[in-house]
Amino acid sequence: MNYEYYYNNVPGQGLCRNNLIYTSLISTDKKVFVQWYHNDTEYHQGKNQVVDPKKMQEKWEREILFIQQLVGTGIAPKILKVDPRERKIFLAIDGPDFWEQAGCDQANYNSVLPDWQDQMINIIKAHKDRGWHKYSMHPSSYFVVDGKLKSINYFFTYRDTEPNISIADVESHIYTTRQDEMRKHLNTLGIEWDKPQPWLLMDQLCWESFSTNYPAEFIERVKCLK
């Protein structure tokens, strides 16, 4: 099977890398997505941010830890293969990601999947029920397979039993535009950038920062989840 780099075609920006951590690959028949935990300079267009090998290894280990726990739940895509030597995860998909199918525009989400809000809420609630805090919540972190959302990108996920972290600890893999959105809410939420914060407060900041990617009513629904 042949693979190629996978990008999101963002209006006004053109082809953009799919994430800041790994190198995204897709099969030419658009049926397999590969998370390749490798710092590929060509794919990242010289804008590599996670260049510390230890950090990359940690992200790989988190991805494997969490996504393998979802096998059989229907929450994540089917894992076709894991190559620990190459640090690759092969996932069964059915075309481009949710955001890409919507033309990278939240106005089109309903046309891709009319009940996307309910489906995404159910996935987020399932994470909460497991005591997980997942911060890679961009709409490109979902694929649609047989009419069902499938969640990926667990490299930015923590258990509520883990020590708290600060934003500064993880800013290397947060887009600068996302950081700008986060800074708008620091004072309101009483958050200091370089000090560890309670997980629930970090959850709230995360969702406040996604106001340009999701409708306001959806974000309010998420914030009400217990």
Label the predicted regions.
Residues 56-62, 71-117:
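Conserved structural core of kinase catalytic domains
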Residues 63, 67-68, 124:
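AlphaC helix (C-helix) of the protein kinase catalytic domain N-lobe
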Residues 137-144:
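Hydrophobic residue at the +6 position relative to the catalytic HRD Asp in the kinase catalytic loop
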Residues 132-133, 145-226:
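C-lobe/activation-segment region of protein kinase-like
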Residues 32, 75, 89, 150-151:
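Protein kinase-like catalytic core scaffold
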Residues 42-58, 103-108, 162-169:
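Short, flexible/disordered intra-domain loops and linkers
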